[in-house]
């Protein structure tokens, strides 16, 4: 009960911070920058422990700098020449790997590049979603998060009822034994319905078919992203990948 209360409280706070960040001008840039840095740091701690801190630090700095430049381009018309800054940091990271890491470290050092692809790269797209026409409009990203949050609730409700019946097929039993196909499709259907509501409420300004597709794709991507995270945690033998948000590992 205490764990549930903690999860609920932190969820409410997280949602409030995300909504405020997406609606308050220019706050979203700082919000996603912090999320990127913390998420990458948590992955590195899970995968590498305290090893290669100088390399992982340069990796986070390079991705963070690239995000700042992209945000500056969309929000303030910053010159693309500023991309030289993250490129220089990235080259320093590669130099640090080549000059200081041993041959037997090669398989482990490869984990340095994983969060650059699965965490930093998607977040680098957010400035283009926040400034679709040159002016800040956080409603599209807000719609994405609303779909994720509520489809997750729908997936849980359907999965915990219909998905627990005898004979119900598991989605990926070797990774997450509790996830069922009932929950998966329940979440997708819920996501499409929520997306439609957001469209007709005027929150999501995309066309109706694009909005419905956004709902379905977002739900599917969130499920398999969650499974990928569970796969990493099983691989590294950890229960939680991080402790930044209490009650949410």
Ranges and model annotations:
Residues 1-216:
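Membrane-embedded alpha-helical bundles of polytopic integral membrane proteins
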Residues 221:
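Extracellular/periplasmic solute-recognition and catalytic clefts
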Residues 234-249:
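Interfacial loop-to-transmembrane junctions
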């Amino acid at each position: 009960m205490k764990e549930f209360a903690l999860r609920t409280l932190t969820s409410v706070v997280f949602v409030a911070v995300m909504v405020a960040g997406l609606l308050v001008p220019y706050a979203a840039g700082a919000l996603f920058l912090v999320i990127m840095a913390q998420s990458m740091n948590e992955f590195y701690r899970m995968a590498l422990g305290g090893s290669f801190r100088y390399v992982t630090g340069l990796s986070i700095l390079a991705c963070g700098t690239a995000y700042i430049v992209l945000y500056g381009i969309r929000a303030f018309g910053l010159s693309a020449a500023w991309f030289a800054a993250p490129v220089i940091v990235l080259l320093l990271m590669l130099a640090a790997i080549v000059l200081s890491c041993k041959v037997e470290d090669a398989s482990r050092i490869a984990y340095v590049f994983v969060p650059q692809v699965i965490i930093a790269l998607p977040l680098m797209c957010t400035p283009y979603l926040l400034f679709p026409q040159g002016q800040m409009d956080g409603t599209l990203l807000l719609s994405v998060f609303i779909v994720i949050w509520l489809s997750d609730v729908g997936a849980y409700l359907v999965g915990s009822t219909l998905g627990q019946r005898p004979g119900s097929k598991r989605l990926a039993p070797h990774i997450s034994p509790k996830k069922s196909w009932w929950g998966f499709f329940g979440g997708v259907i819920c996501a499409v319905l929520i997306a439609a509501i957001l469209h007709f409420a005027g929150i999501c300004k995309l066309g109706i078919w694009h909005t419905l597709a956004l709902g379905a794709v977002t739900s599917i991507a969130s499920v398999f992203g969650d499974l990928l995270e569970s796969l990493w945690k099983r691989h590294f033998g950890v229960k939680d990948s991080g402790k930044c948000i209490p009650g949410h590992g």
